Amino acid sequence: MKFGSAVILAGGKSRRMGFDKQFLQVKNHYLLCHHGEQLAALFDKIIVVSNTPELYRETPFVVVSDEIRDKGPLGGIHIGLKTAVSDYVYFLACDMPNINLDYIRYMRQCLESSPARACITRFGDWIEPFNAFYSRDLVAAIEDYLGAGHHSLFRFLKSLATHYVSEQQARHFSPDWRMFLNLNTREDFEKWRRQGPGLGFHAPSCAASR
């Protein structure tokens, strides 16, 4: 299976938000669970990486915790890839609320026509490491990189044979760049909730308990 797995990363310090962002709620449901429902339209296996796995015991997701602790996003990518069953794995952060399924399909097409170890979007001189695909064969490379004492995700990505989607091409799918929005503060979340579309939740298991 080439594109069967998606990973939602629920870790991070959330300093600016003031609380753990995996607890973001809309209509008394965890936002992360809404992500899982949307991604299930394209992926057979939805994996949540969280160091509080008990939160998701009643959900349909596969829930895992970092195997290599305190290494930032690379630790989450590492365990997500190890748990996945497909050649390529889609990664999303839990604070990215605007999933664009058409863009995910487009990235899959890019990797079908031009295989690489990752498919990542450029934004000016920056890159967007999530809302991206990574090859499952990166597990050993991540272990070597972290074992050598390195932590920087961006330095690691520069070492890969990567298919980069240009900002211009990505804006065909999201002219305002909303599909890469991160909810970093309470103000970000409240603004998004006021402006965003109404969200419907269907899985009772996703009801927030706190």
From Swiss-Prot:
InterPro entries: MobA-like_NTP_Trfase (IPR025877), Molybde_CF_guanTrfase (IPR013482), Nucleotide-diphossugar_trans (IPR029044). Keywords: Cytoplasm, GTP-binding, Magnesium, Metal-binding, Molybdenum cofactor biosynthesis, Nucleotide-binding, Transferase. Its cofactor is Mg(2+). It catalyses: Mo-molybdopterin + GTP + H(+) = Mo-molybdopterin guanine dinucleotide + diphosphate. Mg(2+) binds at D95. One of its GO terms (cellular component) is cytoplasm. GO terms for biological process: Mo-molybdopterin cofactor biosynthetic process. It comes from the Bacteria. Gene3D superfamilies: Spore Coat Polysaccharide Biosynthesis Protein SpsA, Chain A. One of its GO terms (molecular function) is GTP binding. It is found in: Cytoplasm. GTP binds at L9, A10, G11, K21, D66, D95. SUPFAM superfamilies: Nucleotide-diphospho-sugar transferases. Its EC number is 2.7.7.77. Belongs to the MobA family. The N-terminal domain determines nucleotide recognition and specific binding, while the C-terminal domain determines the specific binding to the target protein. Transfers a GMP moiety from GTP to Mo-molybdopterin (Mo-MPT) cofactor (Moco or molybdenum cofactor) to form Mo-molybdopterin guanine dinucleotide (Mo-MGD) cofactor. Monomer. PANTHER family: MOLYBDENUM COFACTOR GUANYLYLTRANSFERASE. This is Molybdenum cofactor guanylyltransferase. It comes from Syntrophotalea carbinolica (strain DSM 2380 / NBRC 103641 / GraBd1) (Pelobacter carbinolicus). The lineage of its organism: Bacteria, Pseudomonadati, Thermodesulfobacteriota, Desulfuromonadia, Desulfuromonadales. The gene is mobA.
